[in-house]
A protein has these predicted regions:
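Glycine-rich helix-loop-beta junction characteristic of Rossmann-like nucleotide cofactor-binding loops
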Residues: 44-48
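Catalytic core of membrane glycerolipid acyltransferases/transacylases, capturing the structured
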Residues: 34, 49-105, 113
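A transmembrane-helix-recognition feature enriched in membrane-embedded lipid enzymes
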Residues: 3-42, 87-96
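Secondary-structure boundary/capping positions in well-ordered alpha/beta enzyme cores
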Residues: 39, 74-75, 99, 121, ...
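A conditional alpha-helix N-cap/helix-loop micro-motif detector
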Residues: 37, 104-107, 138
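Short, basic, glycine/proline-bearing loop/turn elements
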Residues: 28-29, 95-101, 128-132
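Non-catalytic C-terminal accessory region of glycerolipid acyltransferases
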Residues: 2-21, 109-240
Length: 240
């Protein structure tokens, strides 16, 4: 059963996550990912157990939302491309906490749904880069997530994801997540200047952790192996 854009947002605002469905999918996905690649997560205590919170991860892969969701105890809501909600799977995605966003312009329906989720005291994950970044390194963080957090009085939790870059299954290395120090928004106003200030405190944590992990020797070898150069790198190391 397909739904219209308006119906999708109404479901997301009024019904939210289906607890039993969310748990079934979460634990099934966790089992599959552990078999295929493995994953670790640190700093989960930085995500409040209740109350509104905006999680701001970097975005390298379609699978990033799944990894964030399976390591946290509380359900997490995500925006997804509107095209994913055009078919019969739309009700399923909506009850898992996803909701549509139309790209290319400010989508007021999606923004209002995000506000409703935070007013309800739920967790919302937004990718500040706006889309998947396929190039090396990270993209520039936009202010929208911080502005929503300020409006809701919700802390920003910077989150670093490594191991999903340009990979197909099976992943050559484990996926690793680090939930950083929350950035409080008390005393800030929902202005472009204050939103820039808030994301400017959160995003450097992601950049620094991502750069630190990418610089590890084992990560360099794994990345080279993924493009067929691993044997050459390892051979050179053995000769030293």
């Amino acid at each position: 059963m397909s739904v219209t854009n308006a119906e999708a947002h109404q479901i997301a605002r009024e019904k939210g996550v289906s607890g039993p469905l969310y748990l079934i999918v979460k634990y099934t996905a966790a089992l599959v990912f552990r078999i295929l690649c493995g994953f670790t997560a640190s700093g989960k205590e930085n995500v409040p157990a209740k109350g509104p919170v905006v999680i701001v991860p970097n975005h390298k892969s379609f699978w990033d939302p799944f990894f964030v969701a399976i390591v946290l105890r509380r359900p997490v809501h995500f925006m997804g491309k509107a095209e994913h909600f055009d078919g019969p799977m739309a009700p399923f995605f909506l009850r898992l906490g996803a909701f549509p966003v139309r790209r290319g312009a400010s989508d007021e329906e999606a923004l209002e749904t995000a506000r409703a989720i935070l007013r309800r005291g739920d967790a919302l994950a937004l990718f500040p880069e706006g889309t998947r970044v396929r190039e090396e390194g990270l993209g520039t963080a936009k202010r929208g997530a911080a502005r929503l957090a300020i409006e809701a009085g919700a802390p920003l939790v910077p989150t670093t994801i490594t191991g999903t870059e340009k990979r197909r299954w099976p992943l050559p290395r484990k996926v690793r997540m680090v939930f950083g120090t929350p950035v409080p928004v008390e005393g800030l106003e929902a202005t472009p200047e204050d939103a820039a200030l808030a994301i400017g405190q959160a995003w450097p944590q992601v950049e620094q952790e991502y750069a630190r992990w990418q610089a590890r020797p084992g990560v360099i070898v794994a990345g080279a192996a993924a493009i067929g150069l691993g044997a050459l790198v390892v051979s050179k190391r053995r000769k030293k």
